[in-house]
Structures are given as structure tokens and as C-alpha cells.
């Protein structure tokens, strides 16, 4: 099958190359799926997409897949099954995928998901040096039916625009009147040259001049009103576009955040700004520039048809310029947005990890990495700006050539007395009101292309379904027993992190889960709050499957407290009340901070509970953060608390006090701990090793078994 250029798909984020390669093959057979959907099907993780993940995703879409390790002899075959996916190590460092579209004696033709490369050819020697030999060959099954997933285009923003129709109408009216005044000014110039000066009409000249001055004052008032209304429109569009993106981000499942770098998510805000810019410009061009072009075109035609026809000859030149630059701008916009996302990720990562960087004296090393990425971003941005400048230069040359030609030809008409000097000057003055709107319409090309690329990137987020998409009614529970039956879990299509877990936890039980690092303890409890879905098995709360719960209700009933809790910018009181029972009383707040052994620390601060904290409370110790977070959890309405190493930064004495405070509470508490002093005090201990529950019982019982727990305890 011959690969068509229209089937090319570029990756949007760093880890999308496998899904983008699969998308190209699917398009060749008539199926169109977003990268967001393919990521879900292929189990893409923060490390990328495995060949097994691509195979599984293709099989779900009714394709048969052969994954083979082949060699260069594949390209000697007369009927090689092009296109197919090849796994490579790019630049001898990065795992990557190409779509192989063909080959000849010396070259291999590839479609690289990297938007900076796209479709190209490599020498066989260069390709073979990168190729791991792993190839995926896809063919349709008898049950295959092409499917097309709809992605929203820029047209989807029309409802947002129509909601602002009053503001837009006022902007258009103001702009229209301003243009009319400018046109009247041009005719004033013609009358002055052709009538008032030759006939010495001083009185008429004075009256007309004062009248024109008044209209110019009105014009400036309208210009101010237009600028004000444009700001209003811009802010309202920002609320609709940017806030809707933030709202959607908050509704996405944890699996979305665990498979993407922070910068990839935050860089979409600048993408949204590109869309806003394009929307505002398009509104003005559609409603205003087109109207002005038609109106001034009629006036110019009435003024002198010969000169106007000369003007019309320049329009095809503008169109040719647009067509030539379209593919170039698309490629360069992709490059700029992608390198910007990588740069943002690195900066956020390094600021968050600044303490570690300083502790390792690695400032220079990390700076050099950002320096390289920033230079790469600047290079791409400069290339785009250079292309825009070249296009601007060509358009300016066309416009200036047109102006000179009009004056030249117009002067010959004046000399031959076919038009007056005033008519020529007026025509030339009016010409800018015809060409400037056309230039504005042409300039939409770069903005709309940038917006189209930005919209594609936003779509990859919007197409990830909200975890709250399915409306569920709140359930009433007669008890709060937890039960896990035959639970297994794996990230993507990697190895199983949990395997066949059987576990029952009674209401108000105090249970500790222990095990080596990486044994699956944290993953196990994250399933209880539906951060991730089990690969197989069932979890019930109060005898009801967790999948039947509204997630908001579930997380109000089960509160998960991680080892590194986040403290938000604001006062200590604001942080304590986040997620708390509505109208939590002062007595309840004091009880929570006492149970968490943080009351004395807070009250010793100068402003007490009103003490302002910066992002992640860098002024507090790790132990203080953990205790504030614990008090916050105790103020929540949760019946079940999961403390994932939530006291690991505390000294042994404080930790023991907190445990003694928690054990009598009328709540189920699940501790995850490496310190076995925590386990000693709980009702029951669960020992997890390599994703399996291997022992269960009290501290005394497990020591008597001389098993894995006994080894942990003594070692």
C-alpha cells in the first residue's frame, strides 16, 4: 500500500511518537483516532509507548499485528508490506518509532512523528545504525470497520464568539464609523485641492475644516471606545477558553498526570492564548475588514475604474504568498510549541527540585541543560519569526510596488486630463483603506495556523475523558467494610505491580501495610480512592463496587494522605480547612491540630493560624508539613484514612504520640510504613512483597511465624 502524505501524524508531546506512528497506519486504512485515545488504548506511560502497547491498541481496533525482529534483508523483498512501524534508537539515545513508507537500493523512506522532520529519506546505513530490528506489521481483520473520531476544529469556538455578539457589534459599528470619517477626510483633501484653493473659497474652507475637526474628535472618542471594548472582548474570551481548559484539567483522572510532564500541561496555556488572538483577529476581519474592503472597493471603482482594476491585479499575488508559506508555518509552529513545552517542563522540574540540585552542587549541570533547551527554543522561535518577516517583506514589496504603480499610472491620467490631481491624491489616500483590510485578512494566515496547531494540542487534552463524566447519585452505606477480591494492576502493558490481592478491612480497624520499597504498597491504596482502575478484580466499600460510587463521594469517605503532602499558598487556617467538613467549628479545628501534635507549633508563630505560607510552605519543616496535612485529613468527613508514610518525617517520640491519638478514633485507618514501630501498635499487619500479600496477622503472630515480617523487623 502506498503511504499518502495526508496520512502523516505528528506527535504532540514527547512520549507520543508510538501513538503517532500507529495513527499514520490507521489513517492509511481509513481509521482516525486522536492521540489521546490511542494513548489510553496503548497504555502509554511517562516512559512512552511500548511495542506491546501499540500491538494491543491495534488489536482493539480490529487489526492483526505481527511483531517481528528482522534485518536489512527485509528491504530486498519485492513485496515488502509497506507501510510498517519500525522501532529505533534515535541519536543513539532516545527510543523512537518511524513509519517506513518504502525503500530503494540506497535509501529508506520514513515518516517521522517528530514534526521537525516529518516525511523524509535516510540512507540505509543511517537507518540501520538506528534500527533495533523490531518491526510491527499491521493488517485488517475480517471484522474491521473504519472509524473516525471527531476532534473539535476552530469552528467549535463559534458558540463562544456568538455569546459576545453585543460587544462585537459595538466594536464593528465604532470601527465602521471611524473608517467613514477617514474616508470623508480624503474627500475633504480632494475638494480643497480641486475647488477651495483654486476658487479662493475661504469661508467654505473654514466651515468645512471646523466640521471635519469635530468629526475627528468624535473619531478619537470612538477609537477609545473600540480599544476599551476590545479589552472587554479579550477578557471574556479568556474566561471562556482558558478557564474551561483549567476546569477540564481538574476533572481529569490521575492517570493523565502520571503519564505527562507538568510543562506539557502548562504550555497549553500559551496555546490557548494563540487561539484567543486568532479568534479576536478573525472576528474583526470577518465582520469589519470584509465590509470595509467591499465598501472602499465600490468607492475606488466609482472614483476611477482603470486604477481600481490595477489594484485588483495585486490580490492574486497575495494569495500566492499565502499558499507558499502555509506548510512552512505549520511545521515551524509545531516546533516552537513542542520545544516550549520541553523547556517549561525542565524549568518547573528544576525549581521544584532546587534543594536537591543545591545539595548535589549540580547548579551548573542543570543550568546547562536548560541553557541548551532554551537555545533550542529560541532557535525555533527565531526561524518562525524570520519566516514571518520574509513573508511580511514580500507583502510590503507588493504593497509599495502597487502604490508606486498607482501614482505612476495615475499621474499619466492627470497629465492627459482624464482625472484631476485631487482625485488622484484622494484615490491614493483611499487605497490604504482597501489594502490594509486585505493585509489584515492575509495576516490571519499565520495566526490561524498557529491557532490550528494550538487547537490540535488542546484537543489532545480535551479528548481525555473526565473522571466525573458519568453522573452518579450518592449512595447510602450501612457499614464501611472494605474488600479487595482478586485485584491485579499493571501500568500500561508493563509487568504486574499487584497480583491477585485478596484483602478485607473491617470498619474502624487500624491496619498497617508493610513491605520493601517498590513492593506495590502505595499502588494498592491508591486503587481504594480510584486514582487508578484495577486491571482485574473488584473492590467494594460497604458491599458496593467502587465503580458505582461518585468519585467525589468516594474521596470524601476515603481520604488518602501521601508521604509528601502539598501545602498551598495561603494561611495555615486556609490549608487546614481545605476539603474539611462544611462550617467546621473552632473546637473541631483545635481537636484536629491537637491530635496531629501541631497545635503548639502553630500557636508559637507570631500570626498563629493566620500565618501566611508560600507555595509548598518552604518555611516549614517536613514534619510540620506532614502534621498540618494530617490535621487537614482529620477535619475531612472521611470515615477511612489512608496514611501513606504520612509520619515518616517525624521523630519517633512525636510519631508515637500521634499514633496513640489516632488509634482510639472512630475511623478506619490504613497505615503504610517502613518503620515497624507503627505496625506494632496497629490491630493487624499486612505484608506485601512483589505485588502479593504474603503474610497477615498481628505483630506478635507474625514474629512467631519466623517469616518475611520477622526478617524485616530484625533487619
From Swiss-Prot:
- All copies of the ABC transmembrane type-1 domain together span 168-450
Q: Keyword annotations for this protein?
A: ATP-binding, Bacteriocin transport, Cell membrane, Hydrolase, Membrane, Nucleotide-binding, Plasmid, Protease, Protein transport, Thiol protease, Translocase, Transmembrane, Transmembrane helix, Transport
Q: Where found?
A: Cell membrane
Tell me which Pfam families the record gives. Answer: ABC_membrane, ABC_tran, Peptidase_C39
Q: Which GO terms describe its cellular component?
A: plasma membrane
Q: Which residues bind ATP?
A: 515-522
The portions of this protein that span the membrane are 167-187, 197-217, 237-257, 282-302, 307-327, 396-416
Ranges where the ABC transporter domain occurs = 482-715
UniProt family annotation: Belongs to the ABC transporter superfamily. Bacteriocin (lactococcin) exporter (TC 3.A.1.112.3) family.
| Protein name per Swiss-Prot or TrEMBL | Lactococcin-A transport/processing ATP-binding protein LcnC
Amino acid at each position: 500500500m502506498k503511504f499518502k502524505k495526508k496520512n502523516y501524524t505528528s506527535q504532540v508531546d514527547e512520549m507520543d511518537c508510538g501513538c503517532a506512528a500507529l495513527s499514520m497506519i490507521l489513517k492509511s486504512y481509513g481509521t482516525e483516532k486522536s492521540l489521546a485515545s490511542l494513548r489510553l488504548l496503548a497504555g502509554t506511560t511517562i516512559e512512552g509507548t511500548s511495542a506491546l502497547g501499540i500491538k494491543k491498541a491495534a488489536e482493539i481496533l480490529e487489526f492483526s499485528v505481527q511483531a517481528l525482529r528482522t534485518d536489512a534483508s527485509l528491504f530486498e523483498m519485492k513485496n515488502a508490506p509497506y507501510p510498517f512501524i519500525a522501532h529505533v534508537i534515535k541519536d543513539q539515545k532516545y527510543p523512537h518509532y518511524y513509519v517506513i513508507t518504502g525503500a530503494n537500493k540506497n535509501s529508506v523512506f520514513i515518516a517521522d512523528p517528530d514534526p521537525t522532520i516529518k516525511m523524509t529519506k535516510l540512507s540505509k546505513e543511517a537507518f540501520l545504525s538506528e534500527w533495533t530490528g523490531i518491526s510491527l506489521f499491521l493488517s485488517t481483520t475480517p471484522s474491521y470497520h473504519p472509524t473516525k473520531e471527531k476532534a473539535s476544529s476552530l469552528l467549535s469556538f463559534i458558540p463562544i464568539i456568538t455569546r459576545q455578539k453585543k460587544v462585537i457589534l459595538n466594536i464593528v459599528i465604532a470601527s465602521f464609523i471611524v473608517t467613514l470619517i477617514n474616508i470623508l477626510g480624503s474627500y475633504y483633501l480632494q475638494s480643497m485641492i480641486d475647488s477651495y484653493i483654486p476658487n479662493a473659497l475661504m469661508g467654505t474652507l473654514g466651515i468645512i475644516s471646523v466640521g471635519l475637526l469635530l468629526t475627528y474628535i468624535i473619531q478619537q472618542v470612538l477609537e477609545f471606545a473600540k480599544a476599551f471594548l476590545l479589552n472587554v472582548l479579550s477578557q471574556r474570551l479568556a474566561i471562556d477558553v482558558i478557564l474551561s481548559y483549567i476546569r477540564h484539567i481538574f476533572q481529569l483522572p490521575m492517570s493523565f498526570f502520571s503519564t505527562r510532564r507538568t510543562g506539557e500541561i502548562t504550555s497549553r496555556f500559551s496555546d490557548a492564548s494563540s487561539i484567543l488572538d486568532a479568534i479576536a483577529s478573525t472576528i474583526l476581519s470577518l465582520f469589519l475588514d470584509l465590509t470595509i474592503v467591499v465598501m472602499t472597493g465600490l468607492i475606488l471603482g466609482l472614483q476611477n475604474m482603470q486604477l481600481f482594476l490595477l489594484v485588483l491585479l495585486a490580490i492574486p499575488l497575495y494569495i500566492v504568498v499565502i499558499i507558499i508559506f502555509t506548510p512552512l508555518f505549520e511545521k515551524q509552529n509545531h516546533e516552537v510549541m513542542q520545544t516550549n513545552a520541553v523547556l517549561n517542563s525542565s524549568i518547573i522540574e528544576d525549581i521544584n527540585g532546587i534543594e536537591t540540585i543545591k545539595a548535589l552542587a549540580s547548579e551548573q549541570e542543570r543550568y546547562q541543560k536548560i541553557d541548551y533547551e532554551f537555545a533550542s527554543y529560541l532557535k525555533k522561535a527565531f526561524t518562525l519569526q524570520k519566516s514571518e518577516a520574509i513573508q511580511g517583506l514580500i507583502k510590503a514589496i507588493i504593497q509599495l510596488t502597487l502604490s508606486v504603480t498607482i501614482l505612476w499610472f495615475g499621474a499619466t491620467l492627470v497629465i492627459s486630463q482624464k482625472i484631476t490631481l485631487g482625485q488622484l491624491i484622494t484615490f491614493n489616500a483611499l487605497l490604504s483603506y482597501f489594502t490594509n483590510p486585505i493585509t489584515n485578512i492575509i495576516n490571519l494566515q499565520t495566526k490561524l495556523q498557529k491557532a490550528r496547531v494550538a487547537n490540535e494540542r488542546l484537543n489532545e487534552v480535551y479528548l481525555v475523558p473526565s473522571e466525573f463524566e458519568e453522573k452518579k447519585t450518592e449512595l447510602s452505606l450501612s457499614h464501611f467494610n472494605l474488600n479487595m477480591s482478586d485485584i491485579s494492576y499493571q501500568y500500561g502493558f508493563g509487568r504486574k505491580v499487584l497480583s491477585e490481592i485478596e484483602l478485607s478491612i473491617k470498619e474502624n480497624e487500624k491496619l498497617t501495610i508493610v513491605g520493601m520499597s517498590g513492593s506495590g504498597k502505595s499502588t494498592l491504596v491508591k486503587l481504594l480512592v480510584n486514582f487508578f482502575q484495577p486491571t482485574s478484580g473488584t473492590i467494594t466499600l460497604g458491599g458496593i463496587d467502587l465503580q458505582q460510587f461518585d468519585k467525589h463521594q468516594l474521596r470524601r469517605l476515603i481520604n488518602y494522605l501521601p508521604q509528601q503532602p502539598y501545602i498551598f499558598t495561603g494561611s495555615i487556617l486556609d490549608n487546614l480547612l481545605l476539603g474539611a467538613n462544611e462550617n467546621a467549628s473552632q473546637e473541631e479545628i483545635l481537636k484536629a491540630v491537637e491530635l496531629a501534635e501541631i497545635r503548639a507549633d502553630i500557636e508559637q508563630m507570631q500570626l498563629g493560624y493566620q500565618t501566611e505560607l508560600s507555595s509548598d510552605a518552604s518555611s516549614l519543616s517536613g514534619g510540620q508539613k506532614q502534621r498540618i496535612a494530617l490535621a487537614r485529613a482529620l477535619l475531612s468527613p472521611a470515615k477511612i484514612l489512608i496514611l501513606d508514610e504520612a509520619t515518616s518525617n517525624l521523630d519517633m517520640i512525636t510519631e508515637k504520640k500521634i499514633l496513640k491519638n489516632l488509634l482510639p478514633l472512630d475511623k478506619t485507618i490504613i497505615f503504610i510504613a517502613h518503620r515497624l514501630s507503627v505496625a506494632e501498635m496497629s490491630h493487624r499487619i499486612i505484608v506485601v512483597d512483589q505485588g502479593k500479600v504474603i503474610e497477615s496477622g498481628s505483630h506478635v503472630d507474625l514474629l512467631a511465624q519466623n517469616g518475611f515480617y520477622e526478617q524485616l523487623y530484625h533487619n
